[in-house]
């Protein structure tokens, strides 16, 4: 099952470490949803092409395009630059949807009080980060992840670095959190 926790503020330690508070403060996936709007499903990464679960989610949410990304030193061109870009706090004007096929890593998301929640993703986890949420991604100590990226329409992956509080997607996100209507 997915694990999440509030993060420490130590910026001197390797970003690939867990960065748990002392004592740890776990966050359930329901709390993650309620505090950030992030959605989660656990799928079978071995049978998703046959069992229909991913296809149903795609149909229900309008995800019409997919591709696969592998992140490791030997698989991703310009690895160091990409890792820095992924870990820079940013938002997107569209949802960010990732289905983990292999490996593991961390999505850090800001909760409704602007605190970091670290979500550990592993094989079979499907996350939907809402448009307008401040977030970042890093590998863990395994230094490898393979993920399916899902999009509504043609793929757009344009990070809008913080501060971006005036961006329309941010306004809409904040309003959705206030009204409790994240879907």
UniProtKB/Swiss-Prot annotation:
Region (Disordered): 1-21
Gene3D superfamilies in UniProt: Jelly Rolls (2.60.120.10)
Cofactor dependency: Fe(2+); Ni(2+)
Coiled coil: none
Alphabetical UniProt keywords: Amino-acid biosynthesis, Cytoplasm, Dioxygenase, Iron, Metal-binding, Methionine biosynthesis, Nickel, Nucleus, Oxidoreductase
Taxonomic placement: Eukaryota, Metazoa, Ecdysozoa, Arthropoda, Chelicerata
Protein name: Acireductone dioxygenase
HAMAP family (alphabetical): Salvage_MtnD_euk
């Amino acid at each position: 099952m997915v694990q999440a926790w509030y993060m420490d503020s130590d910026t001197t330690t390797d970003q690939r470490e867990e960065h748990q508070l002392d004592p740890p403060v776990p966050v359930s996936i329901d709390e993650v949803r309620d505090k950030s709007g992030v959605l989660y499903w656990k799928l079978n990464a071995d049978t998703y092409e046959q069992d229909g679960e991913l296809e149903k989610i795609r149909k229900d949410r309008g995800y019409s395009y997919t591709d696969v990304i592998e992140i490791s030193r030997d698989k991703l061109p310009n690895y160091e630059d990409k890792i820095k870009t992924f870990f820079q706090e940013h938002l997107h004007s569209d949802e960010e949807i990732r289905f983990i096929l292999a490996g593991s890593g961390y999505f850090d998301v800001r909760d409704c009080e602007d605190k970091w929640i670290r979500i550990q993703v592993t094989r079979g986890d499907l996350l939907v980060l809402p448009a307008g949420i401040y977030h970042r991604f890093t590998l863990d100590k395994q230094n490898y992840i393979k993920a399916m990226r899902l999009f509504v329409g043609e793929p757009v992956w344009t990070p809008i670095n913080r501060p971006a509080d005036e961006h329309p997607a941010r306004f809409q996100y904040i309003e959705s959190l206030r009204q409790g209507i994240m879907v």
